[in-house]
């Protein structure tokens, strides 16, 4: 990881720390509700069950696609993909337990567990982020890369919006999930890069 990337990661960590402080002190609630109302004013769609289905399937589809892509290109990448997903889920669970923030009072469907950060959103960014990484690493055709990356970004945004629309998460839960997932991906990639470099150095020393 280059020095500028380390500074960027540090700034993002500081930003999410400050943002989380605003969330746990209820400083974002007014804006959260305004965003909830705004989304419902823009997206006038009343089939809550369909939105919930889209919200759930977007993550399941992402897990399946990222796993199949990773398995196709490299068994090692498949293992990393599974580890990334499991660790992301565990990280989300730990943060939820740490802050114990209840879900919005205006939720339109049932949901269990705590609110911050959104697990669906975190997992969506992780799995579709993995798809983007695999696409840029292994697929050579530029047009196909662009299409897959654009669809992946669309699914990441759609998942977050669906959670806010359903009222099962505050907008701040979704924003926080995006930032935390981004930090997680940067951190895990740095770990993999460092591990690979260490192995190469050890092999060279043995030779």
Per-region residue spans from a language model:
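N-terminal transmembrane-helix/juxtamembrane module of multi-pass inner/ER membrane proteins
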Residues: 1-61, 97-99, 103-108
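Hydrophobic, aromatic-rich alpha-helical transmembrane segments
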Residues: 3-4, 49, 74, 78, ...
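Alpha-helical transmembrane spans of integral membrane proteins, capturing the lipid-embedded, hydrophobic core
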Residues: 11-15, 81, 85-89, 93, ...
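Hydrophobic, membrane-inserted alpha-helices
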Residues: 15, 61-70, 132, 155-160
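Aromatic-anchored segments of alpha-helical transmembrane domains
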Residues: 16-21, 88-95, 154-164
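Hydrophobic alpha-helical transmembrane segments
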Residues: 21-23, 67-73, 163-164
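Membrane-interface loops
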Residues: 29, 61, 71-141, 145-147
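Membrane-embedded catalytic cores of phosphoryl/pyrophosphoryl-handling enzymes
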Residues: 108-207
């Amino acid at each position: 990881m280059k020095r500028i990337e380390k500074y960027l990661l540090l700034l993002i960590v500081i930003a999410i720390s400050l943002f989380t402080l605003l969330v746990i002190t209820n400083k974002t609630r007014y804006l959260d509700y305004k965003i909830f109302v705004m989304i419902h004013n823009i997206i006038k769609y009343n089939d809550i069950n369909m939105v919930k289905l889209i919200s759930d399937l977007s993550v399941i589809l992402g897990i399946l696609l990222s796993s199949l892509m990773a398995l196709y290109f490299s068994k090692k990448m498949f293992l990393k993909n599974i580890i990334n997903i499991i660790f992301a889920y565990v990280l989300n669970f730990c943060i939820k337990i740490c802050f114990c923030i209840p879900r919005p009072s205006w939720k339109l469907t049932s949901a269990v567990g705590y609110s911050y950060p959104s697990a669906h959103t975190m997992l969506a960014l992780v799995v579709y982020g993995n798809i983007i990484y695999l696409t840029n690493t292994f697929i050579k055709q530029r047009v196909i890369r662009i299409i897959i990356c654009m669809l992946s970004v669309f699914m990441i945004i759609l998942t977050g919006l669906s959670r806010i629309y359903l009222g099962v998460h505050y907008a701040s839960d979704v924003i926080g999930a995006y930032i935390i997932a981004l930090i997680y991906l940067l951190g895990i990639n740095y770990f993999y890069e460092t591990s690979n470099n260490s192995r190469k150095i050890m092999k060279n020393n043995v030779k």
